[in-house]
């Protein structure tokens, strides 16, 4: 008898979000692409508009994904056998870490509803709004608390 686990997961994946960003970025003129890349300040800029948000994922998404997957592999397996966890993400950006976490959990047959809540902290209101949108899409059962806070606050 075959057993198919009933895994609650998002129909979205980070790979699909990344591909949409790349598809948006690719047809831009070389000048537009370079201007956006310059605006990103090597990934350290305070992003203020949708174009910058899209460019950031297109430019840096794969790098973040690789680092995050490596880190998630280091999570002790006993963590996944507890009563659920809270994720605190200081400098959450657009929620790349949360999206990659969802993909990682799905690859390990761990229900997304295992994450009870998220505390998202980010200085950029635009980033934070997009992060909340993605966390809601990827973790529909989780509670979300947000803090829009600058480094000096």
Across the structure, where does each feature detected by a protein language model lie?
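Conserved SAM-binding loop of SAM-dependent methyltransferases across substrates and taxa
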Residues: 94-111
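N-terminal auxiliary segments of SAM/dcSAM-dependent transferases
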Residues: 1-40
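Short beta-strand element of Class I
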Residues: 116-119
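Active-site catalytic pocket residues across diverse enzymes, especially alpha/beta-hydrolases
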Residues: 75, 79, 105-109, 135, ...
